[in-house]
């Protein structure tokens, strides 16, 4: 902070706040009197008529948090009365900064001790800052500055504490144990308001932590990821765990790269690579305020300097601008329309709130900061003044927004001071709103509400003017006009009649298109084609259920297209294609997301015979071979596999969506596709391993598909269950390459490379999530299994559940002779006559365990409901195992469940029961395929897209969900009865 003016609480000469009730005032005065019993300063104050006395009574009456703190810790108030506010705060912040130091030189404290020290310092700082703020001895700038300074000190102390502890345990070797962070290579960035020095009263803190794996402090680089993960888990605990002394700060580390799949701390180089290759515009905005606050500050500054080209691009990037504007639209649309209600309003995120001012600034920083370094500053007020000085906004706008910003920050602080809660919502009740009004010095809630409404409207108006442009959509109808910022009333009425519930949002989206904010609409020709197409687009989308949702998904798709001329021309000349697009957008958010993320998959929809041709193995194989054949090296071959797999999965989905194929056919097609992709990946992997390690004389490999892959029943998004079998000549000890490997390591390497080829995430996505737990001994066994070991295990060690799983085993690619041997083993095991009573007992126990550990969520959980797909699969697999003992021929392993059920049931089931089970299997498969295709997650009729609800009803020719649900209940109840009867009767 800048040099603080020496002010004391005794300087208060006017009391602007007052208690909200006499009862609160009495309670506050009682606290003061109790505190005076052990304090001369407080006793002297109570006996006086000083304004400070009235102020403290009002402050404690208005804030239960402050009152409770004064009651529990009167010494804090005593200390505050005896020194200036800056002196008091500086001493507490310095105490926090050195809280990591132990009594003995170089000895690390227990976590509990530093937690206590930091919490006590936080309590004292929070108490003092609140009183200074409420009394207006501090303005918003000082309040946020002191809070930020304390947060920086607390995080620094915690980091030094953790580094010193790691040093003492031998994990690190510090340069200087008296200054643990010095030259440590540990980068701790404060993000958001902490980075800008604008922390709010009860704020959480956003941190990003990187480390240099080459740093000399790290003793074992292989352990570094886990070491840092443990340290950061302790950091979070030190700062945010609530103890008897309270907490320091809620700590959020989710602004790091890809937080869902990365550790809490990641290497600097990995972070830089992420931002350079995958960084998003919202991450650019987040890093505008980033600041090194702890750890190795010099390393932090170097990192931010290196990151500058990512955050502030030298040239205007129109795709980025489109993205920025898209964010702006989304925020605006989220706010709704109509009058701003004060009660319950979100001061941060609501219309006219703090976030809109921050976004107003950051948007222009992202666009102009690359060419104008003066626009790269962190603080909101400073940046508003710089934007005015640089001519980006006028001076009046800057002053209005600065005044509004600090007014809203004052409101935010009062809301949070009441109970020390991280909330931004104004109270819903009149008494509680009056409390906030009095804390701000207003006479009543009406005057506060009027002042707040004026500020919110000012911010909203200035925010809405950001990048204001004009464009007109010319149409023959004359009642679709999209000009400037204001909606045309006639246009809104037309959109309502077309079927849209939120016409203003739709109009806003269309204005966006015609402003050229997306890459697909940047060229004049593209905008002209889209202009001509828009009336028909609106008509067709308006005919779909929940037209607004579908239209929004189409907008999302459009925003990701690299170009638009070809698409707009095709849609204009091909009504069928337009209807198909609408079908996707209204029914299948998952497919809509796929084409938004990977527009190239859309190309396949242009094939004239798409819906007429079944995607059989013969159809898919040449297309895959031709496309992959152009790969020049290993990685390119894998990328081509990812591209063609994504495209063909999508096209299979389109056929299912339109009813061109059934759910059963989709399962077979997805399985055929997986077979071909895995086979091609195996060929590439074998070639890659051979180039490094040579061939293994007599070496043979075969891939076994298990589960739904084995039985031709994959769904969209299914993972794949694999087993890799191998064999080799016994007399050969190692491969014949430049870097020879023994047989176990050689075929393990093949397996590991295959898993990576199929499941490693890349820019083109992944092929499949691979599960190899069905191999002998599961995760405890080797990843690759020799054929002799596989046979021995199946004959002597396998459990019943593993033999049940073997009924779906199918060799999908590999050496033909080894495939033959594997199939012979499958047949041998599955034709063995078993103890039926034992199989029955095991199956009943397994099904009971699933019921217990994985209960269905609801009737729409087709897999797990009693009498659902799991029961039907158990029936088929159970019958396959007991068939030999009952003189019935089992179908080959890897037979589709429906075919196996019919073959086995014909000799071992009641004919009506067999028909019912088959009917249920077909319906549940159809529904499962559609749901997995169209959405991620579970099917909830209340939340599902309207188009998907229609689809699942049409899947079984049901008029509505009520009839469909009734039939699901009928069939599942019957199947559970059949399951119990089949197993019990066997």
UniProtKB/Swiss-Prot annotation:
This is Bifunctional glutamine synthetase adenylyltransferase/adenylyl-removing enzyme. It comes from the Bacteria. It catalyses: [glutamine synthetase]-O(4)-(5'-adenylyl)-L-tyrosine + phosphate = [glutamine synthetase]-L-tyrosine + ADP; [glutamine synthetase]-L-tyrosine + ATP = [glutamine synthetase]-O(4)-(5'-adenylyl)-L-tyrosine + diphosphate. NCBIfam families: PRK11072.1, PRK14108.1. Residues 475-986 are annotated as: Adenylyl transferase. GO terms for cellular component: cytosol. The gene is glnE. The lineage of its organism: Bacteria, Pseudomonadati, Pseudomonadota, Alphaproteobacteria, Hyphomicrobiales. Involved in the regulation of glutamine synthetase GlnA, a key enzyme in the process to assimilate ammonia. When cellular nitrogen levels are high, the C-terminal adenylyl transferase (AT) inactivates GlnA by covalent transfer of an adenylyl group from ATP to specific tyrosine residue of GlnA, thus reducing its activity. Conversely, when nitrogen levels are low, the N-terminal adenylyl removase (AR) activates GlnA by removing the adenylyl group by phosphorolysis, increasing its activity. SUPFAM superfamilies: Nucleotidyltransferase, Nucleotidyltransferase substrate binding subunit/domain. It holds the Pfam family GlnD_UR_UTase.
